Amino acid sequence: MNQQWNQYIQIIKQVVKPALGCTEPIAAAYAAAVAKRELGCQTPDTIEVRVSDNLFKNSMGVYVPGTGKIGLKIAASVGALAGDPNAELEVLAKINQDDVTAAQQLIDEERVSVARIDTQELIFCSVTMSAGEDTVSVTISGGHTNIIQITRNGVVTFDAPQQQRVATGSVCEGVDISIKQIYDFALQAPFDDIKFILQAAELNSSLAQEGIDRGYGLEIGRTLKGNIEQGLLGNDLMSRIQMMTSAASDARMGGATLPAMSNFGSGNQGIAATMPVVIAAEAFQSSEEHLARALIMSHLGAIYIKSYYPPLSAFCGNTVTSAAASMALVYLAGGTFEQSCYAIQNVISDSSGMVCDGAKSSCAMKVCTSATTAVRSYLMAMGNHSVKNQGIIGDEVEQTIRNVGSMVRLGMPYTDKSIIDIMSA
């Protein structure tokens, strides 16, 4: 396998990871778990959490898995008391109710505080923890588990090299990559080298079933299932993709203690890149190899498109993630590369106006909307219908992707500030 394809695999493995719970509060839980390990105490006296505006925004309304509670305070507190510092995004996988009770007691005793800080970093979390005369600070920046510095009593004990301080959004920087190259890689790479991506299907399908079996969040998946059973909706490809994709997001945002396979630091975007592809593969009776190739196309395509703008912004990343999923649906249906590009163009034209107003249970509605667009756009593409040279949609797909990046980077920072101000009022 050539060096370029090896780079693609490393990119996927770097940003497509299992994650338990919404990754923004989990970043605080992880930092707290590491701080507790470095401090070497049983129970800290105080925990101070400082975060960027965007990390704060995405932690305000989402349940922390295994706790039944919302917010950064409980995430940091339970992470400090019972988190596994070696588990990264699955830091809270082994907590129990006693841990949650003890964590809530720390909060009730006003020993846990959270503050927003002014920083240019979109993903930033610093946890300072004290016990007796000792104080430890752990700082995460650029990625949800990317620790850049640890200090103990003011002395730096770990300082990440400069290359480790780059943000998740720069994973494609300096890499020769395009939609055509992603398509060719997905179709031609040796199956043994890419079959690891099938874990995404396993994890996110289990999460979807959890969302169907139990009531989480707005119960969108369960509602759609009931409508199908009543005959109000057809039991067809569109309805099943809507049902299972939103069910996975219901469980994810509702605090289920099952991991999602994330994409670009987002569990919901991992779901959006995975579940439409999995359900379509079942409908088309695709082989395991075809499913793996479609998932590679969807996940790497999503990573590539999102590399043109910051990982946290006012733009809902499920939209362009679903564009990559739609591309993969065309592949599974036997379409051409040109039709795959049509699908991407159609999705971005349809749903690129969706904003991110924080992580919460209603994100499952946006995931469902994006998945719906992915299916409709794939169907249009298979009929050789594509948006072109309208609005932000360029003459070809690479220009459209660059246009999305420009819109988010240059046009949406003020929107982001306005959303955060509204949510914080």
Curated annotation (Swiss-Prot):
GO molecular function: L-cysteine desulfhydrase activity
GO BP, one annotated term: L-cysteine catabolic process to pyruvate
UniProt similarity note: Belongs to the UPF0597 family.
PANTHER family, sorted: UPF0597 PROTEIN YHAM
Protein name: UPF0597 protein VIBHAR_03081
Native source organism of the sequence: Vibrio campbellii (strain ATCC BAA-1116)
